[in-house]
Curated annotation (Swiss-Prot):
The keyword ATP-binding does not apply. Substrate binds at residues 66, 117, 161, 168, 192, 244, 262. It comes from Citrobacter koseri (strain ATCC BAA-895 / CDC 4225-83 / SGSC4696). This is Glutaminase. Its EC number is 3.5.1.2. The gene is glsA.
Length: 308
């Protein structure tokens, strides 16, 4: 690394970025998220050899939202042959908003990738077909990866999302009309919203996702989470599609595979080195954490890290 890591580096970066708070907007289309304190700012790092660094609000839990789409894909990879997954969802960036219907209509119900809403709903539909208790299975996976036994769903957030689910329901029904959605729409939506409503901290997220920096192997688990090839593929999808329609801008500024959520979290991977989780609830127009991206930009510049 260009500099040796320690908590003081992270604390300095947060101080440098904090003036940006107030320039973004907390997600308000989900009422339960609209009340989150927009001034929160945290970062945590878990290295491939199990060292931890953190600063700011790194221990406070928040709604991970679309970060969960990576986890649902991981579960699907453990239960389906790859060819079955990629027959129903693509591997390309969409270039459109994450909840777009237009592209889905034009491409006959096949979502561009598993990290937009349509793609994640297809993945959840697949899990409904293989798992007897999809919500419980997700909790088991997340608790094992994080090493934290009390991670849970925020039922209030899940309920709030379901009560405002018209667009996601439309996406599911549109895919059903093309034959790319097999199970009860309401049941799958409920599972999807619960996944999005997982509450985790930056520290828990960094530990959960470090397997993607370790070729699919979590350092505290005996069995691989995914194969080394699958870990590489997930990182590639995160690099091209993890930041919604701003994936190119993020690659330019930060240069790491990453996945964001409208709860203000971002998880980024430095392959073979570390997983990074940042949180700042105020979003930019694309739905990504405004200050969170700035923190990652500062960090990668100071550490001299990029996959490009």
């Amino acid at each position: 690394m260009a500099r040796a890591m320690d908590n003081s580096i992270l604390e300095t970066i947060l101080q440098q970025v904090r003036p940006l708070i107030g320039q973004g907007k907390v997600a308000d289309y989900i009422p339960a998220l609209a009340s989150v304190d927009g001034s929160k700012l945290g970062i945590a790092i878990c290295t491939v050899d199990g060292q931890y660094y953190q600063a700011g609000d790194a221990q406070e839990r928040f709604s991970i939202q679309s970060i969960s789409k990576v986890l649902s894909l991981v579960v699907a990879m453990r239960h389906y042959p790859e060819e079955e997954i990629w027959q129903r969802v693509g591997k390309d960036p969409s270039g459109s908003p994450f909840n777009s219907l237009v592209q889905l209509e034009l491409e006959q119900g096949i979502p561009r990738n598993p990290f937009i809403n349509a793609g994640a709903l297809v993945v959840c539909d697949m899990l409904q077909g293989r798992l007897s208790a999809p919500r419980q299975r997700m909790l088991e996976v997340v608790r094992a990866l994080s090493g934290v036994s009390d991670i849970a769903y925020d039922v209030t957030v899940a309920r709030s999302e379901f009560e405002h689910s018209a667009r996601n329901a439309a996406i599911a029904w549109l895919m059903k009309s093309f034959g790319n959605f097999q199970h009860d729409v309401t049941t799958v939506l409920q599972n999807y919203f619960h996944y999005c409503a997982l509450k985790m901290s930056c520290a828990e997220l960094a530990r959960t996702f470090v397997f993607l920096a370790r070729q699919g192997q979590a350092f505290h688990l005996d069995e691989p989470v995914v194969t080394s090839m699958q870990a590489r593929q997930i990182n590639a999808l995160m690099a091209t599609s993890g930041m919604y329609q701003n994936a190119g801008e993020f690659a330019w500024r930060v240069g790491l595979p990453a996945k964001s959520g409208v709860g203000g979290g971002i998880v980024a991977i430095v392959p073979h080195e570390m997983a990074i989780a940042v949180w700042s609830p105020e979003l930019d127009p694309a739905g990504n954490s405004l200050a969170g991206i700035a923190v990652l930009e500062q960090l990668t510049q100071q550490l001299g890290r990029s996959v490009y």
